[in-house]
């Protein structure tokens, strides 16, 4: 037995109305990953299923969708899975440190204090899949890196699963710089 919420029931009804009732079981049965506490992570929509499929098949994936559709969370799930399966040696999560025209100089504290609020969604997803202790141990060993996009300049990242979150906030120059960072054996989302 598994609890199914109203949004999933509505989605199943919509699929049935579109003549895709056979796809409902695929979504219900397909487990993408498990959290640190053993909770099953499943695709909630066909869009998520296509996204996961793209993440499994391709080295570069652009995830496009509204806020709250699981783009970052599922990418982190796949990154952790790739690390656990020894497909990559590192997980690197980054995002532009400035959003909506805000300037870091106006925020209190050192650089780490200034960028941490922007990186919090990435930490939250990592904690879900690794647990706090494991996350901190892997971070200390340099296996996991969560940093502002500006810190990627001049690097070549081999054998890494690299996630750029909130890419829509990048300038064209930042995006070009990011897309030239990944090296051999790396995957980019």
Regions found by a protein language model. Give the residues of each.
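Pre-Walker A adenine-sensing motif
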Residues: 41-57
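Hydrophobic anchor at the beta1->P-loop junction of P-loop NTPases
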Residues: 63-65
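Conserved P-loop
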Residues: 73-141
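Loop/turn-to-beta-strand initiation segments
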Residues: 89, 141-144, 158-161, 185-189
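Walker B catalytic acidic pair
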Residues: 166
């Amino acid at each position: 037995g598994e609890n199914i919420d109203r949004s999933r029931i509505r989605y199943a009804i919509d699929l049935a109305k579109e003549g895709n009732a056979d796809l409902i079981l695929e979504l219900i049965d397909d487990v993408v990953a498990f959290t640190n506490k053993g909770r099953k992570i499943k695709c909630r929509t066909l869009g998520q299923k296509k996204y996961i499929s793209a993440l499994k098949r391709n080295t570069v994936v652009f995830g496009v969708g509204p806020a709250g559709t699981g783009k970052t969370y599922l990418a982190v799930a796949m990154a952790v899975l790739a690390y656990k399966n020894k497909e990559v040696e590192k997980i690197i999560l980054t995002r532009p440190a400035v959003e909506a025209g805000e300037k870091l100089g106006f925020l209190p504290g050192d650089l780490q204090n200034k960028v941490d609020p922007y990186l919090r969604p990435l930490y939250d997803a990592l904690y879900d899949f690794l647990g706090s202790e494991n996350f901190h141990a892997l971070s200390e060993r340099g296996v996991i890196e969560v940093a502002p996009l500006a810190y990627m300049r001049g690097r070549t990242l081999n054998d890494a699963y690299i996630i750029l979150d909130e890419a829509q906030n990048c300038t064209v120059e930042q995006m070009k710089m990011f897309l030239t960072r990944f090296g051999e054996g790396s995957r980019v989302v």
